Amino acid sequence: MLYIVGTPIGNLEDITYRAVDVLKSVNVIFAEDTRVTIKLLSRYKINKKMISCNAVTENKKIRLLLDYLAKGDSVAFVSDAGTPGLSDPGSLLVAAAFREGYKVCPIPGVSSFNTIVSVNPFRDKSVLFEGFLPNKGLKRFKKIAELYKRGDAFVLLESGHRLLKLLVEISSVSLDAKILIGREMTKIYEEYQIGKPLELKKYFESSKEKVKGEFTILVSRSSS
């Protein structure tokens, strides 16, 4: 059995009892970064063999995963934060397990997407998850314009050092876009701000501390 386990996005208390039980019961844990996952395992007194499996190495770890499953071992996969499958490795492992006829079981948990949507103040009928945009170039701007033109709200992930650039890019598409920004969600310095692109740019550029951390951005065209 391959378990795909949702883990916290910041606060280590944000994990289900079921997820903890699964991590305690499996034979081995494939982790995006073992240095990150060891903190979670230590918090819940879980001592298991871990194997690093990230976006670069995932394809090479498929054979190892299948070897474990062939022996009848149970395996869990966890990303650094949140529920695997969105902007994280894991899909290649899942595809291989399905292809070879092994059972795959999702263990739901928190994600940046459902966290930001839960505090969305705009009345959007649908919300798309885009995740990380291309780092630079015309492709990045075109993607923002394409997403905005569709009319659905959409969610982006961005690092602090590119946040101001992103807000300028969104303003180039629409000065009136409605934006909800979650900074360091569930962590010590968690905060949420709403406004139009240039209003938010002014707020976040007012202090270097404000652009530190990880950002989740919901962009809306809602009229309400």
Swiss-Prot record:
Name of the top EC class for this enzyme: transferase
Keywords of this entry: Cytoplasm, Methyltransferase, rRNA processing, S-adenosyl-L-methionine, Transferase
Q: Which GO terms describe its molecular function?
A: rRNA (cytosine-2'-O-)-methyltransferase activity
Q: Name where it's found.
A: Cytoplasm
In terms of CDD domains, this protein maps to: RsmI (cd11648)
Q: Which catalysed reactions does the entry list for this protein? A: cytidine(1402) in 16S rRNA + S-adenosyl-L-methionine = 2'-O-methylcytidine(1402) in 16S rRNA + S-adenosyl-L-homocysteine + H(+)
Which Pfam families does the entry mention? TP_methylase
Q: What is its EC number?
A: 2.1.1.198
Chief subcellular location equals cytoplasm
- Tell me a GO cellular component: cytoplasm
Give the Gene3D superfamilies listed for this entry. Cobalt-precorrin-4 Transmethylase, Domain 1 (3.40.1010.10), Methyltransferase, Cobalt-precorrin-4 Transmethylase, Domain 2 (3.30.950.10)
**InterPro entries in alphabetical order:** 4pyrrol_Mease, 4pyrrol_Methylase_sf, 4pyrrole_Mease_sub1, 4pyrrole_Mease_sub2, rRNA_ssu_MeTfrase_I, SAM_MeTrfase_RsmI_CS
User: Which HAMAP family does the record match to this protein?
Assistant: 16SrRNA_methyltr_I
Query: PANTHER family, per this entry?
Result: RIBOSOMAL RNA SMALL SUBUNIT METHYLTRANSFERASE I
What family does the Swiss-Prot or TrEMBL record give for this protein? Belongs to the methyltransferase superfamily. RsmI family.
Task of the protein: Catalyzes the 2'-O-methylation of the ribose of cytidine 1402 (C1402) in 16S rRNA.
Name under which the protein is recorded: Ribosomal RNA small subunit methyltransferase I
Q: Origin organism of this chain?
A: Borrelia garinii subsp. bavariensis (strain ATCC BAA-2496 / DSM 23469 / PBi) (Borreliella bavariensis)
* Organism phylogeny: Bacteria, Pseudomonadati, Spirochaetota, Spirochaetia, Spirochaetales
